[in-house]
UniProtKB/Swiss-Prot annotation:
It holds the Pfam family Stress-antifung. CDD domains: Gnk2-like (cd23509). It is found in: Secreted. This is Putative cysteine-rich repeat secretory protein 31. GO terms for cellular component: extracellular region. Belongs to the cysteine-rich repeat secretory protein family. The keyword Signal applies. It comes from Arabidopsis thaliana. Residues 39-141, 146-260 form the Gnk2-homologous domain.
Amino acid sequence: MHNSYSLSKRLVLVLFLAVVATQLFLIRNVSSLNLTNAYLHHKCLISQGKYKPGSQYEKNLNSHIDLIINSTFRNGFGHMTTAMGSPNMVNIIFQCRGDSYQSKCRSCFAAGISGEMRCPRNKGGIIWFDQCFVEITAIEVMEVNYDNNFYMHNPNKVMGDAKSFNKETMAFLEQLALEATRKDNMEDGMMALYSAREKMVGTKKLYAMVQCTRDVFMFKTMCKECLERIISQYPKCCDGKQGGRVLGTSCNFRYEFYPFLRT
């Protein structure tokens, strides 16, 4: 039996069991905080073409997946490239949410690899879950990318003065963006490029986060510019909504009236 990337039966079984076991554990322990790992969206990069079963591209892909799935996931992100400049080049990048590390990040990565079957045998594809995104491409990713951004929002509108709410929420997100790119916001010797807090907006508590993909950004200015750009899209995405987010492969933000992160 073959999945979209023709992974071996053994690898598919290992990934599936890892996803099921970890997700059951997470659901049981964090459901009260609305901490889920729901599938959000995917995009097949059709222009990059397809690969054939048994090809060198497939072998490179499977080798990458094996190496990543057996890593520690300590930093919550990874970027692996092989055969640069050749038709068989495989590039995998994943970023887990700022509160998802180690086993939680591994589980999300495994779910992402399994989810790539939505793009059968495509060399390129991106999939987003609540706690991570996984991108597989046949090209090297070396710059900020806005082409794959998309919006999500709560269909319910805020009660009261929506204009005032929008202003406060955008200011809060802008403040988090500054915190995410502070020089002293370090983690494991690298800039965290992530910030999350809560704040009273009117009579309700608002929870929010911002994050940049750590491996893409060599300089904090790139992260800052990315966050500024997507926060400026707030009026299109989230005008007067009780919750919303802009996601992509370079940076993202989210806000809700309920806790969605681990403390």
